Amino acid sequence: MIVEAILDATPLPAHAFPAVADAPSAGVFAIRHTVSERETSALVPHANNIVILGWIDAIASLHGAHAGAARADLATAGRMWFVARHEVDYLGEAFAGDRLILATWVEKLGRTSLIRATRILREDGTALTRASSRWALVDLASRRPTAIPDGVRAALVGAHG
């Protein structure tokens, strides 16, 4: 999966991207991304659903790192986010050279899991993808859900560009 460029992206300040219709007024984390040729399919030259899932995962990872809860740090502490569910609406296509905004925020925070919203849109505001994902924090030794630490909870809800 080609997500290295996303993982090195700089967060955007809230005023630097188009309004996302259903996003909260605060707590949105967003980056710019230009679709590369390597991210498109050979048979149908657009970013396919597997690449888009990679973008959803990458923006979640970057948001966590920006909030002080990087995956490497979680793994060192014996924890990791596991996806329990992705629900993705594909609203339009992305092609090589398209300049996109990837935005994410925490919609609901439970004791051991959260619901994360992700939107992918063109810079002109055209919506391409709407996703909702449930992520569970899992203890790596027991492979069971574990409580989200208060510091991580506060950071994820408050982290935005």
Pin down the residues of each PLM region.
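Hydrophobic beta-strand-centered segment that forms part of the acyl-chain substrate-binding groove
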Residues: H63-I115, L128-R130
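A structural signal for beta-strand boundary/capping segments at domain termini and interdomain linkers
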Residues: A127-L128, P145
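Core beta-strand residues in small-molecule sensory/regulatory alpha/beta domains
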Residues: L91, R119-R122
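Short coil/turn motifs at secondary-structure junctions
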Residues: L109, L121-G125, A136-L140
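Short hydrophobic alpha-helix segments
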Residues: A131-S133, P149
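Conserved GNAT-family N-acetyltransferase fold
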Residues: I56, T118, A131
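Generic structural detector for well-ordered beta-strands
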Residues: R32-S36, D89, R134
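Hot-dog-fold acyl-thioester-processing enzymes
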Residues: I2-V83, L140-G161
